[in-house]
Amino acid sequence: MSDTLVLRAATPADAATIAATIAAAFAQYRGKLVPESGAFGETAEAIAAELSRGAGAIVAERNGEMVGCVMIQEREGDLYFGRLAVLPAARGTGLARRLIDAVEADARRRGLSGIRLGVRVVLTDNQRLFRSLGYREISREAHPGFDYPTSINMRKSLV
C-alpha cells in the first residue's frame, strides 16, 4: 500500500476528529503550561460551531486517517493560525511545516498580507520552528490573571 498524504480544507463533519487530533497532539503539554492550554477544552461541538461561523481548518490525512490539523481565521487583514496539531506517530516527518505551508498558500489565495500566530513563551522549540519559517515576534502578552508574559505573538509578512 502506498503512503498517501492529503491536505484539505476541513468541513464541520470533521469536527470530532479534529478535536481528537488536537487532544492527542497537545497531551504532551498537560501540566506543563501555566495557565493550562485552552486546547484541552476543545470539543467537537465548539469546533463545528467555529467552522460554521466562518473559521476554517486544514487537515492532513495519511491513507485516509487524520494525522494533523490546524485552525485558521482571518484577523486584522492577516490569516491567524492556531491549534497546530500533529499526532505523535506523525512527528518528525515535516508535517507541521506542510500544514504551515498550506496556511500560507491559503492566505495568499485570499490576498491577505500576512500570517499571525500565538505561541507560549515556554515552548522554545515551537518558537524556533516558526522563526526558521520566517515568523518574527511582534508582541508578548499575559494571559488573564498573570503579571508576566505567557504568550508571544508572531507574524510573517507575505508582501
Where are the predicted features?
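Conserved catalytic-core motifs of GNAT/GCN5-like acyltransferases
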Residues: R116-R120, R131, R136-N153
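Conserved acetyl-CoA-binding loop-helix of GNAT-fold acetyltransferases
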Residues: V86, G92-A105, S132
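Conserved GNAT-fold acetyl-CoA-binding loop/helix
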Residues: A20-A48
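A short beta-loop-alpha structural element at the N-terminal edge
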Residues: V6-A20
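A short helix-loop-beta-strand connector motif used in the catalytic cores of GNAT acetyltransferases and
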Residues: A48-V59, Y80
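Conserved GNAT acetyl-CoA-binding A-motif
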Residues: I100, A107-V119
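Conserved beta-strand in the GNAT
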Residues: V59, E65-Q73, Y80-A85
